[in-house]
Amino acid sequence: MPHYQEVDDASGDGGPMAATGPSREAVKKMDQIIQNFHTKAAIIVLGARVGLPVVFTKEGTKKVNKWFQIETDDTDAYRDELHTWRMCGGFQNRPPPLIIETYLDTSHLTSSQRLVIVDDLGKRWDALDALSNSCGSNDGRSEVILERWKIELRDIPGEQPYDFGSTLPTIYKKCIVFFRSLYSTAKLVPAWKFKKSLGKNGSPTNSLIINCRITTGDTQPRRIDGLKQPILDHSGPVTSTYVLGATDTPAGQIFAEVTYRNDCNFRVDDSESILSSRFMGADEHFFTPSLAAKGDLSRRRSTKQTEIGSLPAHKHLTDDSGPVQTYGSLSTFHGNAPPRGSSPMSALRAQRPIGSDTSSPPVGSLPYSRPSLTSKGSLKSFEGMALARRTSLSFQPFKAGSLSSSPSRATYAGETLPASPGSLPRASGISALAQARNRSSLTAGMPATLRGGPVTSDNVVPTSVSSSPKPAPIARYSSSFTHRRSRPSYGGASKLVDDDQGSSGKQSVSSSVQPGSGILAEAGAGGSSGSLQTDDDNISDFLKLLDSKKTLQSFEPSGEASKKRATAQLSKFQSMRDSHNALTDSMASSSMLQRSSSSSSRQLSSVPPMVAATSISAASSPGKPISPHTPHTPAIPSRLSANSIAEYDQPRRVTRRSRTTEARLEDVQDNDHSNDAGTNAIDIPTSPRPYYPHARRSSSVAQQHRALAIDDDLGDLPFGVHRSISLGADDREPPSLSTLLNIGQASDDVESPTGQSPSLLQPAPRISEGSTAMSRQTSSSLEAHDSEVPQLSRFSGPGSANSPYRPRIGKTGGRGVTPPQTGSFSSLLVDRGSASGSERAGGGRYSFSRGIGAYEADDEPLLFDMSEIGRDISRRSIDEPRGGYEASRGGDSGSSSRRGSRWGR
């Protein structure tokens, strides 16, 4: 509680009131509350508007007023003005209303300065002149009242006063609430904001000063209130009044309110600028054209009354609706502009045609076209978008544009814009160039593997650059999996070459269009770069695509479920990327193998012996179409080929170097069993092998061991065995069966019965069971073609050079023990050329009696011909006896020469 002053008991005021009413001490405390209420309110308002001097104590500290729990610096300013309220009381000497006016003092303005106020529209008004005109007096006003505060102690009620001593603490607490409200309100009204703006901007000449004055309600009120006089010429209220509240006391109700001017945006301007602005505003209407004067007379009059004395009257009321960009700029849009920052897709979608198009295409211009066999809705959207778009040759500087890369102020999809004339000659159908240029990150295009093979569309007419019909519009967006190299296409379609797949992030036309759209149906037509026809055609189709009202899945407002679904789909396609790459590479290599092996042929049993026209691919079964999804198909012998049966009972690993003699001689013995049931098997001579089961050397192609049931290829031809399919087999044509039989019959005639080496007549250490089927098939196929000819397999021994089943003897030492070679190399070459055909015939290469057909389609020599020839000679020379070696070599050379001459015939 504040410190109340002591009441003088000798004062004669208290007589009857003391006997029947409140005590003298309670009355004194009530008077102190009313006095400090007025003075404290005045100090708060004055301190917020003007600077007040501070009173210091004897100790040198500031004297602080702590009434109503708000600390304010005590001041001697306005002490005389506030003397009345310092000496007032609640019941006797009642105070008059306290009025505090805050005004703007303009007495320091020079003759060249004017106090102006700026309205919300930016117009300047001369404040002092407006106030003088409204008051009707010519006295030079030098102030503008900003606000007025009023604090009043109203009359006490008519009942007899009661003892209120016990209610004083409650009254004091109510006053605390009021002063908190007053302190806040004093810093929220416009006058305080204007005072703060003056302090920030500064006034070097002190031309504008805010002052306050204190008046009482007893003064004669003015005939015209300066606070309520309008300065701005508008119909809005000039002032506003805010009631802070009323505090009930035993002495009466304390009422407080504030009335303030709504517009306080005052400033000082040069008087000449105000005068010239006033003249310019008046001249603006004097020079209006006469034709427009009649129609706009009423509007001009009202505007003139509003903006007298200032230039920028209606400039802010009009909206700038001119074109955003001028002719000749990139991607021009005309008419009402779309909102700034909107995407180019929204701007294009907002285009609409105007009433008619007066332009016509020139004679030499490129033709435009309409889509063929389109629906009614798509044709309607095509015509509307084609007329609205003014095409240009503007290429985007970047390879892929984003969805918000073009600033524009367009309306949205529901609204439309007028189009510019001259857009008809350039509106055309689809092409692939501009779509690849205009595609965003969502329309980048899939690689050929994900798109699938091109399918011929029913509503597409492939055209060249000079033809009129164009393909139908694209039905959907491409996927965004891009930056991948081109793959060859299958299914009978032409190959689409992606010429710019290697560039950084840019995808070519062929990889960004859809398979069935027919955009690339005429690849290479009008192949000049920068073709105007392709540019204009595809721009029109791009507009059609935007007009199809299809919402991308990424922009569908379907909530969290659609986002998860889209994320799952994108993740699935991203995980399929590597597998599709591998599949495409495999398909590409398979197609190359199909072309390389398509010329390798095989004689069927039903075809005449000398005719080799029927060919069967080595990479697929007979009658099976070549499929792009079966790369590297192994050549499995077909059961249709002469009833051949593959045996897989006892596979063994053999190599080109470890071919044994017994594999060929077993065929001879098995043929004896199949043809002569009563004939016993003869001993097959072979050389002893200390390292009989040789492991196959790793192949240069597969780098792995390959298990074969038997070895029946090509006899002693060391370089014609185990051909890989990937090396190709289309450079040689196999001999016919008749040729092979003639060679075999001639070899029987010239064969010497004593030519066998006795050292070779040793029993074979092992005879494979799988050779039985092979020899039986060989003999049966030979007898079917020529029954008169003796069996090719019935030879006296493998030592003869003429025998097609001549064993490869030297298989003991491997590669490291080959001795030096002797003998005639030319005879070996003749032997090679003459014996190759018969060995193929006897070995069952072309008799369709193979057990395993892993190498049956390869006839061209390997890359290691000469090394294999030398290796075969060295292997034979190891096992042959020293004495009979030269004789047998001579016999071999002679017989080989004779066989070579017979073969040449």
Swiss-Prot record:
InterPro entries (UniProt xref): ATG13, Atg13_N, HORMA_dom_sf
Basic and acidic residues composition bias: residue spans: 659-675, 871-883
GO biological process per UniProt: mitophagy; piecemeal microautophagy of the nucleus; protein localization to phagophore assembly site; protein transport
GO molecular function: protein kinase regulator activity
Subcellular location, record wording: Cytoplasm; Preautophagosomal structure
Ranges of compositional bias, category Polar residues: 323-334, 769-782
Domain of life of the native organism: Eukaryota
Keyword Isomerase: no
Primary location class: cytoplasm
Transmembrane annotation, as ranges: none
Region entry Disordered, spans: 1-22, 295-377, 398-425, 444-535, 554-704, 747-850, 871-905
Pfam families: ATG13
Biased composition (Low complexity): 454-469, 502-523, 586-606, 888-898
Annotated function: Activates the atg1 kinase in a nutritional condition dependent manner through the TOR pathway, leading to autophagy. Also involved in cytoplasm to vacuole transport (Cvt) and more specifically in Cvt vesicle formation. Seems to play a role in the switching machinery regulating the conversion between the Cvt pathway and autophagy. Finally, atg13 is also required for glycogen storage during stationary phase.
Subunit structure comment from the entry: Interacts with atg1 to form the atg1-atg13 kinase complex.
Entries under PANTHER family matching the protein: AUTOPHAGY-RELATED PROTEIN 13 (PTHR13430:SF4), PTHR13430
Family named by the database record: Belongs to the ATG13 family. Fungi subfamily.
Record-given protein name: Autophagy-related protein 13
Organism in which the protein naturally occurs: Sclerotinia sclerotiorum (strain ATCC 18683 / 1980 / Ss-1) (White mold)
Classification of source organism: Eukaryota, Fungi, Dikarya, Ascomycota, Pezizomycotina
Gene: atg13
